[in-house]
């Protein structure tokens, strides 16, 4: 006869040996408590990401009944006519111009490739047409970058970054009309190349742990911020004409008075701004992008 504990089950009866009870109460609990001490706590950035947004397609996965219906009904993943024409013409021609061996050897793309990217508004794919951009969807942008990457990873990154991270999208969402009218047309045609100064030397791209900071001051009757920062691995920084600089704003003297608040912000700095120095070009993984 099995020496165990009789418990109710959903269908019939089950016998659970006492050894399993002991194992659960001792070893498993001890291992769990140990893991809690060893594993790092969720950072502020991770907590913000976990709490952001709403439940979408992922909810059906955790419910055990995943379905693509929600995604198909919500997103139209087909290319528009303009995007398809661009893929079959401009992107196809660009791929024919790219010689990855030479790009890697010379650590740069040829001048005619740079000129073609600007003339055909590759840097303005996400910028609305009213500002001179192409007004492509996220899917269109993704398809363009994917095809370019089949010929040159460095060229793909060069095109991808201005259309994803940094001043372009931030200006469209949060910029003043004056800022949009000035910057967006220039960004669309590559007259100004942007870069996004987020990654720090000590904190990486964890924005919540960023040590770069700026103190609100008044100088000559003008309200401003004196910022101190050190950034690293900023793609396109060597050729950028404008920098989207991320830092923590501190207002110890309460000078903002309702016109702003403490926390993470982005400042637009033109190349040559007093105090802004772009250092030596780094060599991440021997990539040829700037």
Question: Where does each model-flagged region fall?
Answer:
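Short helix/loop capping segments that flank catalytic or ligand/cofactor-binding pockets
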Residues: 50, 134-136, 182, 205-207, ...
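Short, solvent-exposed loop/turn segments at the edges of secondary structure
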Residues: 162-166, 191, 207-209, 238-242, ...
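A gly/ser-rich beta-alpha-beta helix-loop segment of oxidoreductase catalytic cores
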Residues: 195-216
């Amino acid at each position: 006869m099995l020496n165990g504990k009789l418990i109710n089950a959903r269908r019939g009866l089950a016998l659970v040996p006492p050894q399993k009870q002991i194992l659960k109460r001792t070893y498993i609990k001890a291992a769990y408590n140990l893991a809690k001490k060893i594993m790092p706590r969720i950072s502020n950035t991770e907590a913000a990401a976990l709490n952001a947004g709403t439940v979408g397609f992922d909810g059906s996965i955790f419910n055990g009944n995943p379905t693509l219906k929600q995604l198909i009904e919500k997103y139209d993943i087909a290319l528009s006519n303009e995007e398809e024409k661009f893929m079959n013409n401009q992107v196809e021609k660009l791929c024919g111009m790219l010689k990855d061996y030479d790009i890697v050897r010379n650590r740069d793309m040829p001048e005619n490739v740079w000129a073609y990217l600007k003339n055909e508004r590759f840097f303005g794919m996400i910028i609305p047409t009213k500002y001179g951009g192409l007004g492509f969807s996220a899917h269109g942008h993704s398809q363009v970058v994917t095809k370019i990457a089949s010929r040159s990873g460095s060229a793909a990154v060069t095109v991808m970054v201005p259309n994803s991270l940094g001043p372009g999208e931030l200006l469209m969402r949060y910029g003043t009309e004056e800022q949009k009218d000035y910057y967006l047309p220039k960004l669309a045609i590559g007259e100004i190349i942007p870069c996004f100064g987020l990654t720090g030397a000590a904190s990486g791209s964890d924005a919540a742990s960023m040590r770069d900071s700026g103190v609100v001051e008044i100088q000559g009757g003008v309200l401003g911020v004196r910022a101190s920062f050190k950034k690293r691995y900023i793609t396109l920084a060597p050729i950028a004409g404008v920098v989207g600089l991320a830092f923590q704003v501190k207002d110890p003297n309460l000078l903002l008075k309702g016109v702003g608040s403490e926390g993470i912000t982005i400042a637009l700095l033109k190349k040559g701004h007093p105090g802004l120095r772009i250092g030596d070009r780094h060599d991440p993984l021997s990539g040829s992008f700037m």
